[in-house]
Each structure stands twice: as C-alpha cells, then as structure tokens.
C-alpha cells in the first residue's frame, strides 16, 4: 500500500485482519508511513511490525548492488520498464523514481524471507512496486484497483495487469474500465470482489434516533471528490424550507478550511459540525444516532472518482438509510428507490429533495 496506517482505508485494514484470521502470515511493506493523530487500534498494532524503509540507506544501496551483480539484465529491464511506463507524467514519474530504491530493497527482503506472494492495494504506485518486485524476483504479484487510482493516471496499467497473477477490482464498473483500456486478454485476470464490512461492529441498531432534529451523517476525507460542499448547500436549502436539520461531517483533509468558511457564510454554524477524524468504532456510534448517511461523491476536474464508498456499506449494515451520487460503482450497491436513493452528482437541489423525501 502507499501509506500505512491510514484512517480512511478501513477496507485495507479489514482485509489484512481477515486474511490473518485464515491462518496466513501477512508481512506489511508500506511505501510510506502515515503520520496521524487518530489511528484505528488494530492498525496501530500492525504498524508496530510493518517494514517501513527510508528512501535511501546503506542497506538499500547493498540491495541494488546485489541485484546488479546477480542479474544486471533483469535489474536494468525493471528500471527501464518503470521509466518508459511513467514518462510523460511529472507526478507519476517522480513518484516512481522516488520509490524505486526502497522497492528494490523490499524485493530482496521478501526473497530472503521466503515470501510466496505480493498483493498491492491501488493500481498506481503500489501496483508499480509489485510489478518491479515481479521483474526482479520470481515472486508473483497481484493488486486491487479501487477508484481514484484508475481515473487520474493509467500509465503502466496494462503492463501491470499483464504481469500480475490476478487483478481484483471492487466493482463491475472498474472491471469494464480495465477491459476497455487493456483489451480482452485482461478479462481472464480480473475478479470483482466488493470491499467487506465488519458486521460485528457495524450491525443493525437496537433503536431508531429521535424524530427531530433530522440527523445527517457524512463520512470521508474532506476532499473535492467526496462532494461535501454540495451537502452543505443542500442543508442550507433544507433549513430555508423550515426543516430542523443537523449535519455531521466526519473526516479531515485539504478542503476543511473551505468547508468551514462555506458553513459560516451560509449561517449554518449551529446546524453543520465538522468533527474531524473518527475511528471505526467512533463512526459506528455516530451511525446509531443518524437518520441518513450521505455520500455526495463527484468527479473532480482532474478526473478523480470514487469507487464504492465503504461508509455506504457500513451505514447499510447498520440499517441506516443512504443517499448517494449516481456515479462509478455506487449503483451496484445502492438500488435507487429500493436500498437507498441516488441523485445526480453536483446537484444540491436534487440532494435536498431526496433528503426531504426521507
């Protein structure tokens, strides 16, 4: 994975724990350490044994010498494939060069310790790491493609798919996208496996919340792709219509200051709360008091899109009604009018109308 332990990536944490429950030894090789003030307790324990590496060190240099001596052709071929595949995208190229030294070191460590298989989360730099490890060693790799990683930059995607033992994606929408990009041969390597939910933690609540005020919950990184600004505008429309509404925005991120200004400008300081990050247990507690969970996702100007927000699955597991954008793989989870309500992205009026319907 790119970073660990990341609060928002509960789907990665849940998968690690579930695989370990099956008796499989899991070793973690994150590309970067995530520095956060709130961490899931289970992730904190895993981080204690994760293999974090600096970008450059003497052991890393020794690993490069090891592969250069053993098979200069494989080493040069792996580096050339990375440079050729990422050329033309400044961000991807710089990121790929940045991780190359430590990935070579990780490859040597995995080989020395008898790692049988490498699985990577996200089809961008983590999958590139798996691709490199596969080129340097005989260890097979696979990866999971989620959402934004397939939309912003697909460089090397088809090379990664071709080299992988298999590829998991979290929606039929993503599967179709990969087949369109890489052609029919990719179809045989693809499996759709939706992200899971801890139903021991997220389970039907014992009692409904009080009828008033109408309580709206939104969980996710405060980022343009999550569309929280459109929910704030929908809350303004509901308040103008005389509806006693309270909205709780869970998460943190680059849009926090802008959202706080929007809330203040709309006069919603007593109706919309930005409460910051919460653990999985904290989100479960908030769901117990919510009338609805909203996922107002939007495509960004750069083309970034969500896959299927895990917060939607968690809410539905708790029996909480959901309203979400009709986007990407979300309609595979939310059957409009049956298991939830779907609205067009970037449409606060439609969002407010759906919330009034509830």
Annotate each predicted stretch with a short phrase.
Residues 10, 214, 218-237, 243, ...:
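A conserved mid-protein helix/loop that constitutes part of the nucleotide-sugar donor-binding site
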Residues 90-91, 140-147, 151-166:
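A conserved, positively charged/aromatic
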Residues 173, 196:
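Carbohydrate-associated surface elements
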Residues 257-281:
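Nucleotide-activated donor-binding/catalytic signature segment of Leloir-type glycosyltransferases, i.e.
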Residues 277-279, 285-290:
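Short alpha-helical donor nucleotide-sugar binding micro-motif in glycosyltransferases
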Residues 288-303, 320:
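Acidic donor-binding loop of glycosyltransferase active sites
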Residues 312, 317, 321-324, 334:
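Short hydrophobic beta-strand element within catalytic cores of glycosyltransferases
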Residues 333-337, 341-348, 357-358:
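Conserved acidic donor-binding segment of nucleotide-sugar-dependent glycosyltransferases
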